[in-house]
């Protein structure tokens, strides 16, 4: 089975051409978008940013790994499911770790910005 990331034109309800291959087949969480960029978390722990216009992969960050934290406690990320990324003040926020439905456990809040 081939998986694809596709944009849909709302008025006719048809996919834009061409569809992009290679997205994760397990992207159950809510999408988050800003002008020209769509963020998608997946069960493999990756947070990906796609160009809204053509679906091109712009950025990919693996959250399913150990992290040093500001309070010195080790934390581990996992699957990204449920709520999507929150975008505010030029930053993107996610919580990594979701053990339900076969996901990878963890519990680490992450913030991305310039």
What are these regions (language model features)?
Residues 1-27, 32-82, 86-114:
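Extracytoplasmic/lumenal domain signature
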């Amino acid at each position: 089975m081939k998986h694809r990331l596709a944009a849909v034109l709302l008025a006719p309800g048809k996919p834009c051409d061409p569809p992009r291959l290679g997205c994760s087949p397990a992207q159950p969480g809510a999408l988050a978008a800003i002008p020209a960029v769509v963020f998608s978390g997946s069960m493999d722990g990756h947070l990906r940013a796609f160009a809204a216009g053509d679906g091109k992969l712009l950025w990919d960050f693996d959250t399913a790994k150990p992290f040093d934290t500001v309070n010195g406690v080790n934390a581990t990320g996992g699957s990204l499911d449920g709520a999507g990324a929150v975008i505010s003040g030029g930053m993107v926020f996610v919580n990594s770790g979701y053990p339900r439905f076969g996901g990878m456990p963890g519990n680490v809040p992450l913030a991305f910005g310039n």
